[in-house]
Amino acid sequence: MKNIYLALVSILLFASCGQEPASKIENKIKVGSLGFHVSFVVPNDATERMDQFITTHEQFMRETHHLSGDQEPIVLSYSVFKSPELNNPFDPNSGETGNTLYGLTEIYSGPEGVQAHMTLGQQREAMFAELVDLTNTYCVAGLLGAPVIAAME
């Protein structure tokens, strides 16, 4: 995990070259914003653990992140999705697999927000350890510090 964090910080530092300070950036998702999206497939008998983590993470986000202003992290979007996993995602009548799908998405205007988020998150050791364990156990895809490539501007 430390190697992932170091790689992410390196990418963020490189990506920040020539960017406006956070105070001069409009708080709107646009091409070039940076974000996270992590997808989990969780057996139905383990969803209580994931739900507890989501509650803890949302509380962390509300306590430490901002929706506007100059102080990072300024989160442009934070959302969590939850749905039963269907045998055929395009056919709601296909039945369920016995798993629940979760998607966690966060978007920041630039690398400063992502970096501030990572720093604050790692300071909450129990929450971060639970995220690492859940990710190692249930994560099927993750975009970390990825640029937005299309947005409704």
Residue ranges of model-derived segments:
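Hydrophobic alpha-helical membrane context
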Residues: 14-15, 122
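Short S/T/G/P-rich N-terminal loop/turn motif that feeds into the first structured element of a domain
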Residues: 17-103, 109-119, 134-153
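Long amphipathic alpha-helical coiled-coil segments
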Residues: 124, 131-133
